[in-house]
Amino acid sequence: MFILNPNEENVILFSMKDFQNLNLIVPIKLGIIGYGFVGQAVAGGFNQASAGKDQIKYYDKFKDSAPLEEVIRDSEFIFVCLPTPMKKNESGIDLSIIDEAMPEITKLTNNTGKIIVIKSTVTPGTTTGYEKLYPNSQFCFNPEFLTEANFLADFMNAERTIVGATNDLVSRRVAVIYRQRFSKTTIFQTDPTTGEAVKYFANAYLSLKVTFANFFYDYCQKIGIKYEEVKKMAAFDHRIGDYHLEVTTLRGFGGKCFPKDLVALMGEMRKARVETSLLKTMWEYNKKIRKIHDWEEIPFAVSKK
C-alpha cells in the first residue's frame, strides 16, 4: 500500500510542484457508465474540480444519454457506476447488472490503454476476477463513500480516496487525476481486493453503530433515562463520536446501501466459512425495529431475481 497524503512531501511523487493550481491540470476524457447518484457525483465532481476542463460523457440505458460506444471511444477513464443490489432471498449480492455490461465495455477497451474504474460496490475478488476474464483491458477499483442526500458535496470533500489496482501504472494514472483535482483528500494506493474489503468494512461498521445505538435506546427506555443525554456524554469521547448514533422515528438503518451491503458481506463470509452471527443478529434486529423496509421499494437496491 502506498499513501499519498496532502500534508506530506510525497504529494510531489508525480513531479508536479503545485497540484492545487488549476492551470496545471491536464484535462482528461472521462466516461461514466450508469448515471444514478454515484455517476452524477463523479460527473459533477470532476467538472467542478477541473473548472470545466475535463470532457465528460455518460451512458445510462434508462436515461437520455450518449451511446455506450461513443462514451467509451471518447474516454480515457471509464467509471462504472452500475447498481449491485442484494438478492431477493437475502443470500448475498447480485452482480448480474455489472457482469452483463462488462463484455460490451471490454470489447471497446481491449488493447487501448483505457482504464475501467469500478465505482460500483462489489465484493472482494470481483475486480481481479474481471482482470482474469478480460486480460486485454485495464482495471482499477475506486470505491465511493457517499450519502445519497449529499453525494456531490461528499465527493468533492472526500477524506480519503482508495485506488485499488494490480498494475502500478494504472494505479498511478488514477491517483494523478484525483491528486490534481482534489487537493485535500488522502490517496491510498492498494490492491483491488483490499479496496473492495474497505468499502464493506466501512458500511458494515456504520450499520453496526446504528444498530448498537438502537439497542441502547431500547435499554434507556426500559430503565427510564434519556438516551439523548447518554449519547451526548458518551460521544464526547473522540474514539466514539456522535456520527450514526441518532435514533430516528423510523428506527434502525435503511436506504439503498447499508442493507444491501450488509447482506452482501454476510453472503461472502458464509462462502469463506467465517462466523456471521453478529451480522445476522444486526440484520434481523434491524428488520424487526425498522418501521418501513424502504430498501425493498428503492430501485436497484433489491434484485428481482
List PLM regions with ranges.
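Internal alpha-helical scaffold of NAD(P)-dependent oxidoreductase catalytic cores
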Residues: 14-18, 23-25, 52, 130-140, ...
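NAD(P)+-binding Rossmann beta1-loop-alpha1 motif at the extreme N-terminus of oxidoreductases
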Residues: 14-73, 77
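Rossmann-like NAD(P)(H) cofactor-binding subdomain of soluble oxidoreductases
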Residues: 77, 86-150
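Conserved NAD(P)H cofactor-binding loop of Rossmann-fold oxidoreductase domains
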Residues: 82-83
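C-terminal substrate-binding/catalytic lobe of Rossmann-fold NAD(P)-dependent oxidoreductases
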Residues: 226-280, 291-299, 303
